[in-house]
Amino acid sequence: VILLLLIASIPSDAVQLKTKDDMPLASFHGNARRTLQMLSNKRICCYPNEWCCD
């Protein structure tokens, strides 16, 4: 049981701490995702009703 707890507590390569260089890239991806989602929502909304494209 102790061995299993030790193995579970060892950090893996997939889980790494974020550095200050990682933050702008994560922010960029979040902004890009929000922009694409907004554009796709406007296209669906505005196609039948052009007045909603403000």
UniProtKB/Swiss-Prot annotation:
One of its GO terms (cellular component) is extracellular region. Pfam families: Chi-conotoxin. Residues 1-14 form the signal peptide. The modification 4-carboxyglutamate is found at E50. Belongs to the conotoxin T superfamily. The modification 6'-bromotryptophan is found at W51. The cysteine framework is V (CC-CC). Contains 2 disulfide bonds that can be either 'C1-C3, C2-C4' or 'C1-C4, C2-C3', since these disulfide connectivities have been observed for conotoxins with cysteine framework V (for examples, see AC P0DQQ7 and AC P81755). This is Conotoxin vc5c. Expressed by the venom duct. Its main location: secreted. InterPro entries: T-conotoxin. Keywords: Bromination, Cleavage on pair of basic residues, Disulfide bond, Gamma-carboxyglutamic acid, Secreted, Signal, Toxin. One of its GO terms (molecular function) is toxin activity. The lineage of its organism: Eukaryota, Metazoa, Spiralia, Lophotrochozoa, Mollusca. Residues 15-43 form a propeptide. It is found in: Secreted.
